[in-house]
C-alpha cells in the first residue's frame, strides 16, 4: 500500500499573552521569551491507502488540532504533513457561512475546493437529497441546528469524493438514522481504499469502523497501531479515568496542561 498521509514531527505552539503589553514585547523584541502552549508536541505517523484511523483521547488532548492540520486548515509551527491526494474535512460547521443559505453554502464551499460552476450545478441535487434538509436548504445556515449544519457539511464533503477524508465529531450530532447513512457511505470509501481519519468519543463507532488507533494525550502521540492492540489500552485508561472523582479528573487534566506550558 502507498503512503497517503505522512505526518513528520508536527508541533503546534500557541503564544499565551495576558496583556497587550506582553503581545507588543513579543512582536518588537527579538527572541523575547513568553509563555507558550504546546497543543501538539512532535507527532509523527504514517497513514496508508485503506487505513481508517481513529483519533482518540479525552477532551483537550489535541485531536481536533491534529485533524485540522491534516486537513490543511491549520499549519504546524514545526514539522510537515505530506498528503498524496485531495483532502476533505467534515466537522460541525467547518467551512460554512452562517450568513449564506444552505444552497449558497454548497456553491461557495465547492468553489473554494476548485470546482467549476457547471460541476457544482450537476452535483447540487445529490447533495441536497443526501442532506435531507428539504426546504431548509434555502434558509440561512445561522438558523440551522448543529445537527442540520453537520448534515449539510457531511453531504458536501462526501459528494466531492476526496482521496483523504477527515471526520471530526461530525456524526456526534443529528439523528441516528442519518449517522448510520453516513457510516454506510464511509464504508464505501473504505472499500475504495481511501484514507480516513475519524475523530470521535463514540468508541462503539470507532470499534465498528476503524482499522487503526492514534491515541493522543496531552498533545503527544501516546500510542499508535492496530485497533485490537491500542483500543483496549485506551478503554482501560478511560474506565479508570471515569472512576475518578471530579476533583481527581481535574487534577489529572491540570497536570497534563501544566506539562504543555513552557517559557520560550
UniProtKB/Swiss-Prot annotation:
Bilayer topology term: Peripheral membrane protein
Main location (coarse class): membrane
CDD domains reported for this sequence: ABC_KpsT_Wzt
Domain of life (superkingdom): Bacteria
Residues annotated as domain ABC transporter: 5-243
SMART domains (UniProt xref): AAA
Localization, UniProt: Cell membrane
Catalytic reaction equation(s): ATP + H2O + teichoic acidSide 1 = ADP + phosphate + teichoic acidSide 2
Gene Ontology cellular component terms for the protein in this record: plasma membrane
UniProt keyword annotation of NADP present: no
Coiled-coil residue windows: none
Protein family per UniProt: Belongs to the ABC transporter superfamily. Teichoic acids exporter (TC 3.A.1.104.1) family.
Classification via PANTHER family: TEICHOIC ACIDS EXPORT ATP-BINDING PROTEIN TAGH (PTHR46743:SF2)
Subunit structure, interactors included: The complex is composed of two ATP-binding proteins (TagH) and two transmembrane proteins (TagG).
Protein's name according to its UniProt entry: Teichoic acids export ATP-binding protein TagH
Gene coding for it: tagH
